[in-house]
A protein has these predicted regions:
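Acidic/aromatic/glycine-rich contiguous surface patches that form carbohydrate-binding/processing clefts
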Residues: 246
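Extended intrinsically disordered or low-complexity regions, especially N/C-terminal cytosolic tails and loops
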Residues: 1-238, 250-330
Length: 330
């Protein structure tokens, strides 16, 4: 692990940062009055995990306020360690919830679409035909463009000399995935497994009302809930990306998007915050799809463990950044 350090803290945007050894990283933290229970163990941790991941993500929450230079007041390196591993553990629970929703969505879309449009072998490949989906209104240029270039609808394109320029989606998939390539005409419930969550999200968006209503009923919702469900999927997609890139999910924050009605539908249905969305709002979305007792238990355990360490102020700051300061709200 290594640290890239800015030499001039008065600059808002540094040109670059200088490399620092593990010992130099600890010296920098020392100079900012960060306390250590064991510098040896701190060094071992910094060799395993990047300084940027361990320190930078949490420092704005723990730095002393109102000082021109970076400075800590009664903050320990071990506080950063506790926050970092809490975030890591929460990622595991969060991803498990998202994977569950994702798996159920794949199953529901494939089953209900096939039941409606792919009942015979002659109809097997109808899921690649945009005629069986609902095109967005032409006034929505962004969504219309996505529809016209959607993965499932991609056909083979040729150069004037007859050479292939781009392969059809299904042909590419047959080459990449052995379980798809074993079929001449792979059924939807096989190919849908290969779609990333982003493509799965748009597959739901582009379903017509007949299929969409069936999918929503599988999740205990009605067609009127379509916008809220779509917004929930988008938020979970963003959270999944944050987990996949090992970003801090305890600092998760998402602003409203005009194209998704600023998430107003899901805010109403799930009782989310009226402004920006935080981790607690993701938890409320999970509640629409199943239980959240395991995540709530993990948050409570983290909080009480820090109380026992005499670090309640750190726990308060952490859950406050996640959406609510009072544990009872969670």
């Amino acid at each position: 692990s290594f640290l890239i350090e800015n030499n001039n803290w008065s600059e808002i945007m540094p040109v670059t940062k200088d490399f620092k050894t593990i010992d130099e990283q600890i010296a920098v933290l020392d100079s900012r009055q960060l306390k250590f229970k064991s510098k040896k163990k701190a060094a071992e941790l910094l060799r395993k995990y990047n300084y940027f991941d361990l320190i930078n993500g949490f420092e704005s929450m723990l730095l002393k306020q109102g000082t021109p230079n970076k400075e800590y007041d009664d903050v320990y390196f071990e506080d950063f360690k506790d926050l970092f591993f809490f975030d890591m553990k929460l990622k595991k629970y969060t991803l498990a919830k998202i994977f569950d929703v994702e798996s159920r969505l794949r199953t529901s879309i494939a089953y209900n679409f096939a039941e409606t449009y792919c009942q015979t072998s002659a109809d097997t490949m109808n899921y690649l035909n945009p005629a069986y989906y609902q095109a967005p209104p032409v006034t929505d240029t962004n969504l219309t463009n996505r529809f016209h270039h959607f993965d499932l609808f991609r056909t083979t394109q040729y150069w004037p000399n007859g050479n292939i320029r781009t392969r059809a989606f299904i042909d590419d998939l047959k080459r990449e995935k052995e379980y798809v390539g074993q079929y001449e005409n792979p059924p939807f419930w096989v190919t849908i497994k290969a779609l990333p969550l982003g493509s799965l999200y748009y597959t739901f968006v582009f379903l017509n009302s007949t299929v969409k209503e069936k999918v929503l009923r599988d999740f205990g919702m009605e067609l009127d809930d379509s916008a809220a469900f779509e917004q929930a999927l988008f938020i979970l997609k963003e959270m999944r990306n944050q987990c996949a890139h090992l970003e801090l999910i305890t600092r998760f924050k998402i602003k409203g998007k005009p194209s998704l009605n600023y998430f107003n539908d899901i805010k109403t249905k799930a009782g989310l915050a009226r402004g920006d969305l935080f981790y607690i709002d993701v938890l409320k979305i999970f509640k629409l799809f199943g239980g959240i007792a395991d995540i709530k238990r993990e948050i409570a355990w983290f909080y009480f463990r820090l109380i026992l360490k005499g670090r309640q102020k750190i726990a308060d700051k952490a859950i406050s950044k996640m959406g609510r300061k009072k544990l009872s709200v969670w």
